[in-house]
Amino acid sequence: MNNYLRKLVEGQHLTEEEMYKAGLLLLSENILESEIAAFLVLLKAKGETAEEIYGLVRALREKALPFSNHIQGAMDNCGTGGDGAQTFNISTTSAFVLAGAGVKVAKHGNRAVSSKTGSADLLEELGVNISSTPNEIDYLLEHVGIAFLFAPAMHPALRRIMKIRKELNVPTIFNLIGPLTNPVNLETQFVGIYKRDMLLPVAQVLQKLGRKQALVVNGSGFLDEASLQGENQVVLLKDNEIVEMNIDPENYGFSRVKNEEIRGGNSQENAKITVGVLSGEKSVYRDTVLLNAGLALFANGKTETIEEGIKLATHSIDSGKALTKLNLLIAASNEKLERVN
C-alpha cells in the first residue's frame, strides 16, 4: 500500500490495475485503518479518474456475494449521495414508480452516510425487510419486479471501510462507486452524482461495465438527482456512444422549484413523503419524482423520449401500480422464502 500512497501524495494517478490491487488491499484484513483513511483522503484530494474508479469497482464486485441467476433486463437507479442537500429519498421513491411501469429494479442502497435518512432507513420504516439473500433477491426481482440490495450485506468486505467513511464524514470515492458496485448483472442504469466533473468518467465506467444504456445526471445546485431548480447536466450512454446533454425541467412542463423546498427529514418524515407521492398526492415531491423516474424510464429504453418517460411515470403513480409495488415488496420481503434458499 505504501507505493500507492506515495503516488497519491505526489499527485499521480493510479492505473486501473494498480487501483484494482489497491482495492483488494483495502478490503483485506492486512491493512491499518489509518492507511485506509489516508488512501481515501489522498485520492479525493487528487481527484478520481475513470480508470481508478473502474479498478476499484472490479475489486468490490469480485468480493461481493455471488448471484447465481442473472435476471434479464434489471436496472438500478441508485445515486451517489454526498450532495449535502438533505432532500427526501428521491431515487428510492422513484424506484417504485419504475417497477410500476414494468421495469425490474435491483435497488442498491445503504443507511444514511452524509444525509439524515438513507434508502435502507426509509425502506425499514415502510416495513420492507432489507435483509434479503441473493436467492431471495432473485425471487423478488422475478415475481415482484423490485428488490432492495443492502450494500453492507452484499459487500461484507466493506465493513471496516464503512466505519471509516462514517468517521471521515466527507464524500469519498466510495460515494461515487456505490451505484457501480451492484452485484446484479444490470442491463441499464440511471445514476445521480454529486460531482459535475465526474459525469463523463462515471459514464465511461458504465460503458466498461457493459451497460446497454445508461444516463448519468448532476442536478441543478449540484444535486445527485435531477432537480426542478434549473438546468441539469446529463451524460447519456446509448449504442456504446456517450453524449452530453442539458435537461431543463421547464421544457417538460414543470415549474422551477428550489432544492430547499424538497428537503426531507428523519425516516418517519421521509416515509410519509414517499407514501404521499405513491398515493398520487400533488406536490413538489411528486414533480421531482416524475422528472427523475421519467429520465430513468428513458435511460432504461422503456420509452423512446423523455416526454414519454414522464407520461409513463405519471401513469405508474396515478394507476396505483407504483404503490402496489411497494405493498408487494413489503409483503414478499417479509415472507419465509425457504423455497429459494
UniProtKB/Swiss-Prot annotation:
Pathway: Amino-acid biosynthesis; L-tryptophan biosynthesis; L-tryptophan from chorismate: step 2/5. Homodimer. This is Anthranilate phosphoribosyltransferase. Its cofactor is Mg(2+). NCBIfam families: trpD (TIGR01245). 5-phospho-alpha-D-ribose 1-diphosphate binds at residues 79, 82-83, 87, 89-92, 107-115, 119. The lineage of its organism: Bacteria, Bacillati, Bacillota, Bacilli, Bacillales. Mg(2+) 1 binds at residues 91, 225. Its EC number is 2.4.2.18. Anthranilate 2 binds at residue 165. Keywords: Amino-acid biosynthesis, Aromatic amino acid biosynthesis, Glycosyltransferase, Magnesium, Metal-binding, Transferase, Tryptophan biosynthesis. Gene3D superfamilies: Nucleoside phosphorylase/phosphoribosyltransferase catalytic domain, Transferase, Pyrimidine Nucleoside Phosphorylase, Chain C. GO terms for biological process: L-tryptophan biosynthetic process. GO terms for molecular function: anthranilate phosphoribosyltransferase activity; magnesium ion binding. InterPro entries: Anthranilate_Pribosyl_Tfrase, Glycosyl_Trfase_fam3, Glycosyl_Trfase_fam3_N_dom, Glycosyl_Trfase_fam3_N_dom_sf, Nuc_phospho_transferase. Mg(2+) 2 binds at residues 224-225. Binds 2 magnesium ions per monomer. It catalyses: N-(5-phospho-beta-D-ribosyl)anthranilate + diphosphate = 5-phospho-alpha-D-ribose 1-diphosphate + anthranilate. GO terms for cellular component: cytosol. Belongs to the anthranilate phosphoribosyltransferase family. Catalyzes the transfer of the phosphoribosyl group of 5-phosphorylribose-1-pyrophosphate (PRPP) to anthranilate to yield N-(5'-phosphoribosyl)-anthranilate (PRA). Anthranilate 1 binds at residues 79, 110. HAMAP family: TrpD.
